[in-house]
A protein has these predicted regions:
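Domain-level signal for soluble alpha/beta catalytic cores
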Residues: 1-368
Length: 368
């Protein structure tokens, strides 16, 4: 039953030889075909490591991407990636290379999307283990263009009525869900930082000062995501990972889930939530009282630093969470990916696998 008792968010550290190849490609000294060969090799090696650590579902580590979200969103028809003066949110420390998105035409999913080929390659090499595909949530396109970028956003004529924008994003994602399913995908994940931002009181105050009603936007997002999920076949699992920022081991949002819990946990028809709970920035487990029959994957093990968590403490926190959600609905994972962007978090390849081994051991001791 997906998500699995011990699971992953999705991204893994890029090996140095892949980073070197990407730099050579950017300089024009390596062709696209040559880069793809290097990516294929890195993904094959990664999948073997994922299987060796005992994962029930593997990903391609997002090794072909620069960012966890922009690559996919910019591949949608009607969306363009543009350079920016600064990143749309401020991380506490390192800052990513600045880029943003612009909606220039009718939004649609490209049925020849390279992301479908990315999944097909993963499925081809994974053997008999399950394959999980991660893509940014439908909410992310609106968040980047219309919320973070609210002061400069100008709706094209087609989307003067914002309801039309929400609807056509949902339709594009319906097409994406069907297309991934047709390639054999039975485990899809929406990655979403909007909810992390909506939990942060400073950000709520800032957006309110711009005239944005985050509570209404949150309801609109749940409605849009649920519309996208109407395309989900019975035998497909779609989960959501909620993040507060994960670049070079830093973050950009802070605050417990209470401000969004009733709307999101009580209203979103997703199959499971991957929730960050690796620090006090994520608050307590009380908001989980709004969970219905969804699985909750507790991100109790940080992907931001190499220090291994204490098993007893993690087990105690699982017990705490079980006061609000049945133990049988709970699972365990890292708090986020290890490399949400190509730069990666500040830990080693060996460190990330020690974390995964710890997660597996704890899960087996708790759930058997």
């Amino acid at each position: 039953m997906k998500p699995y008792r011990y699971d992953i968010v999705g991204s893994f550290l890029r090996p140095d030889y892949l980073k070197d190849a990407r730099a050579e490609y950017a300089e024009g000294t390596l062709s696209a075909d040559q880069l793809r060969e290097v990516e294929d090799k890195a993904i094959k090696e990664l999948v073997e490591k994922e299987k060796a650590v005992g994962l029930k579902a593997v990903t391609d580590g997002e090794l072909r991407r620069r960012y966890w979200h922009l690559d996919f969103l910019a591949s949608l028809v009607g969306v363009e990636e543009i350079k920016a003066d600064h990143w749309s949110v401020a991380f506490k420390g390192h800052q990513p290379k600045a880029a943003t998105l612009e909606i220039v035409d009718k939004i649609d999913f490209d049925e020849n999307s390279e992301f479908l080929d990315h999944f097909s390659y993963l499925k081809e090499i994974a053997g008999d283990v399950d394959c999980k595909m991660t893509i940014p949530s439908p909410a992310m396109l609106h968040l980047i263009c219309c919320v973070r970028g609210s002061e400069t956003y100008k709706a094209i004529d087609r989307y003067k009525n914002e309801d039309d924008l929400y609807h056509e994003i949902a339709l594009a994602y319906q097409k994406a869900i069907k297309a991934f399913y047709a390639r054999g995908c039975r485990y899809l994940q929406f990655d979403d930082t909007s909810w992390g931002e909506f939990c942060d009181q400073n950000k709520r105050d800032d957006y309110a000062s711009r005239g944005l009603d985050l509570d209404q936007i949150a309801k609109n997002y749940v409605k849009m995501i649920n519309e996208a999920l109407e395309a989900k076949p019975e035998d497909m699992t779609i989960t959501m990972h909620i993040c507060r920022g994960n670049f070079r081991s830093t973050w950009f949002s802070s605050g417990g889930y209470e401000p969004v819990a009733e709307t999101l946990f009580g209203g979103c028809k997703i199959d499971g939530f991957f929730l960050e709970y690796d620090s006090d920035r994520s608050g307590d487990f009380k908001p989980l009282r709004f969970i219905k029959d969804q699985k909750v994957v507790l991100g109790l093990v940080t992907s931001k630093d190499p220090e291994l968590e204490d098993k007893t403490e993690i087990k105690e926190r699982i017990k705490e969470a079980a006061q609000y959600v049945a133990l049988d609905q709970l699972c365990l994972s890292p708090q986020c990916g290890f490399s949400s962007t190509e730069e990666g978090n500040i830990l080693t390849d060996e460190d990330q696998w020690k974390k995964m081994t710890l997660i597996k051991e704890i899960a087996e001791e708790v759930w058997g």
